[in-house]
């Protein structure tokens, strides 16, 4: 056979193979497409069918799941903190929980509703640590599912499925604090369309009947219509999928209050001095601070997050540490940075991380980073991490939008409690999920995991307590579907009743309903008359935020003991806007001083501690670092003008502006952070440069300096610190 004939014989065979491959690929694609089409239609029908049932079931207590009396709306007021402490001192408990974050609170609620007498103590405030510093998402973990598919990892698949079940449960048991949020995944390369579409559809499929709503693809035009700030260049389209969002600190508190309503004794600002053991070396209680009284308990649960090892060392000084904390930084930007009802996911940042960009509490939260760190009671956000997040945001937003350092209203660092699994041979490998360790002395340690799965973690921890300490619960786990504080009589239009019945402003009523649920009426009854035709009641703490002075009084009933408890966790103001938090601080402290009978010394202490918290843990100090790094970019004329204004402020003629003088002028600003409380001329020049470059944006300082120079442009609108996106 000649060479030419052999080539002719080969060509039809090659074409046949190609046709078979194309037919096979088409067939597989058709089957997959048909499967997802059926799944979409089925899920959509189920969603439409169940949606109304969901809202009706939460509209009135009479129609909520009545399988257990535990789900009836509790009547009466909460016990006082003094009553809880007395009960803790006088009674003997089945379980003592150390740690008042999401997991510890979940353990207390689970154990108490099983009929086990439970106490909980927290060194600081409920949710004062990692649980209040999250990304505010209730999610299954899209990236974990991606890893499960790519690596055929069954363990990660089970993690995602478990988290998606818990996501649905949280949305059901606290609908006033949580809600579905559409998240956009913008696509800039054509090959990413089928890749991400398949991954997101798998996320829907794993959700099963717990799906929130089906994901879908939109083209470039619709993507820009929905998210106008998005970068237009090379945009192909976007995928929209759904996850949950919540108010994390308030959710944590709702779990604690629900445990207390069911009979648990939970106290914040109580530390464990040391653990008590019986003659057999088994734990039998703990010695607490304050009056140094012992709490007797048959079983002790260590749910202290990043501080896990400190309690483990109390039980066994020779134990090996297992916690390897990682710092995650988030920043808050003004609300105009994102649409009010759509988030954004950057699935692959410049260093391989994932960053979320989400609307939250009428602002925009962005994060997170992931950096190994040391354990700290007061973690501070690093300016380098803040700049990294801003850089990633710039890469996704329209080039016409100037993403400024001065627009960062708040920033915080949360310690993620990554742990090694002591139950495995390779004890240095990080556990992908949570771990439960039972020590020789019967200390039950629950560590790792994430916010979404707190309830499942708590269930497993209580199961371990029952087994290890031979406890006798009256029933099994009752927490799936157990309504949390404020959820029983909540329904989506409850805020209208507040407006009509009490004469409260609409945005304030929405805030009250979505923060306190059916307890919003209690807060409304505590409000004072405004003396105006409208609103009739409800005096705001700050004109730009819906928080009321009556909420400070109610926060005390919710066991707020310090000013930080109020501005950070009962209200979320320090997480949203540090400038506004400084401005309301005096009023908050005065209300608390009156209600709690603080001495003058205690009042001054509370003011100082709260200011330090805002400056150090909420990002003001990092802001000053960024200002000090600004290069001088002033002309000779601008430097002369700055010097004249500096001299006008320097009343003592000592070539420095002291924090006391500055505070008289600017209120509670952060000038005192520079040069150990003094602002020198060189630093004043840097401030001017920051104002010029956009590192610092319009605020009272700018207006005051303009007034000093007699150059105030009355035709130019002066924006409030909130609307301008920050300030010094």
Residues of each region from the PLM?
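Glycine-rich active-site loop/strand segments that organize a redox cofactor
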Residues: 127-161
